Amino acid sequence: MEEDFVSQLAATRLERAKVIAAAGGIDEAIASGQLSERIDTTLSEALVLGLLQQDVRRYLVVLGHGSTEIGEVLRVYEEAGVIQTYAVRHETAASHAATALRWVTGEKAAVVTSIGPGAMHAFAGSLATASDGLGVYYLFGDETTEDEGPNMQQIPKHEQHLFLKLCSTMGNAYCLHTPLSLPTALRRGLNTIDHPYRGGPFFLLLPMNTQPASMKDFNLQELPVGTPPSLGPAQDDGRYQQAAKAVAKAKRVVVRIGGGGRDAGPQIDQFLELADGVAITSPLVSGVIPYEHPRNMTVAGSKGSICGNHAQDRADLLVAIGSRFVCQSDSSRTAYPNVEQVININADLEAATHYGNAMALVGDAAATLEKLNEALEQEQTVAPGTQSDWFRECVAKKQEWDSFKAERYNQPTLQDSVWGGQVLTQPAAIKVAADWARSQGDVVNFFDAGDVQANGFQVVED
């Protein structure tokens, strides 16, 4: 009897999946009359359908007894051609692959693991997802909701939802304790992974007893769609004019470009000219203005360049655009010793108010800069193209930096006592790889953490 039920369930799922595949999506299948708005399903199938509505079609998986039911649903929907699964050897690798996919192509993916150690491996890998602000779903098998005692593969403690607490420290998380809570969980997930300014990992914990739970007459229209909207420009209240006056008064303007400024290249370029400022960039936005741009002083901070750190140390006004002020960028609060005022443009309130004596402009970076540039044009007292002492000083430092790097590229090897011969230096090796990647046009570089990462910041010339 049980085998008959399982076989019938698989057949029903496959038929439904084929209808969706043929129609091109859930909404199209409903519109064609081939799929009812209300279906009898299980939580795991409804979850896969909900993720499909959010255009999640790729799953990187290391399955186990904690994810048996979700794995069965994925098997059926892959057979129908609706989704694709990729079995990988390690959960951390799955996490990194999903992160890279979102970063390079913008495509969303989900990482699926079993209960306990596997989930912990993927959780460790999600640090990259969180650090780089990229939206990825994580589906972890979880202990049952019946509290029959600690699960031997999870945290051995008599307390509820310990993995939920753990995951909530890295990003947003939700335990599917009740099948009908699925729409709420998926809306929170959608708002997290498609956040317009800073995405992140979203952890869905799937208790083993709720994964196969039936959902009778479930309304597919409850599955959330629609990405969260972006902000407009920061509210005025006279602050644009106030900021423009502060910029016009300053003698040495530096613009710190963080990840939130990656889509504001033209507006930043115009601002630099109007403000007679120079830019220092975070590694995330290498290329937001070209390396060759005369006002681009490249990276600054504890792993910065000669010219970037000079601009950071000498500036009297800081304009921060989409920056989080991580320890490496502002040298653990020792940077900007001569800055007297900060204009902080950010979509996040906490980041926008990070520094004291700051004028916070909370809004979209590009839209806010457009309004600030309009205000600056009214305040401008220096003719465009004029080369100030500040500009010439920074240009000279960039020339010094380029010469410093050239010396090391011209001597690409050093004698190494361990290897007993000449060994390629790290800057030279990275330079060769970066130049080759750029020459190919479509090759992406990923840098490991630590000193490789630091030299990568300094070598790349996007």
Describe each model-derived feature in a short phrase.
Residues 383-403:
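Internal, active-site/partner-interface "lid" segment
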Residues 2-385, 432, 436, 441:
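N-terminal alpha/beta PP-like core and its mobile active-site loop of ThDP/TPP-dependent enzymes
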Residues 202-205, 389, 446-449:
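Short coil/turn segments at secondary-structure boundaries
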Residues 11, 342, 396, 407-410:
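A generic structural signal for solvent-exposed, polar alpha-helical segments
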Residues 43-54, 65-75, 269, 398-462:
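Active-site diphosphate/adenylate-binding microenvironment
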